Amino acid sequence: MLKVAASVVVKDGKILAARRKAERIGGGYWEFPGGKVEANETPKQACQREVLEELGDEAEILERLKVKRHYQTPYGSLEIDFFWTRLKTFNLKHVAASEYRWLTKEELWDVDWLEASKPAVSLIAQTNLEKYDE
């Protein structure tokens, strides 16, 4: 089973969405910054590392979103943890994504999300973001 951790970054009442590069599996779809949990690493640690690698930013990882964690994909089993995240720096390098967008809760469904991200998007749309904002 592939273990993945993703950061739901909140700033100024908006959520950071990342569009997967066309050549990657799921290319063109939107997701939250994140990636594989490495051996001897917790999902929270993976989020911090992935935010630094993908965005060039340091992050404060907050609590885990209480959403579905296990998915069966055409490529195998996936376990994903989503975490509310605050950025400590704001470089936003385009390393893993072809594009980034800051979306309001009302705009969340204006982009095509990866299937595994949709339960998190549904929860975010119903959440008061002030608790996780700066």
Placement of each model-derived feature along the sequence:
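Short coil/turn segments
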Residues: R20-A22, W113
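Short histidine/acidic/glycine/proline-rich micro-motifs that form metal-
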Residues: V37-E38, H70-Y71, E107-W109
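Conserved N-terminal beta-strand and adjoining loop/helix that marks the start
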Residues: M1-L16, K36
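Nudix hydrolase/Nudix homology domain
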Residues: G27-Y29, F82, K93-E134
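The catalytic Nudix box helix
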Residues: F32-L65, T104
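Active-site-adjacent beta-strand/loop module that shapes the phosphate/pyrophosphate-binding cleft
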Residues: E58-A59, K68-L92, E99-R101, K105
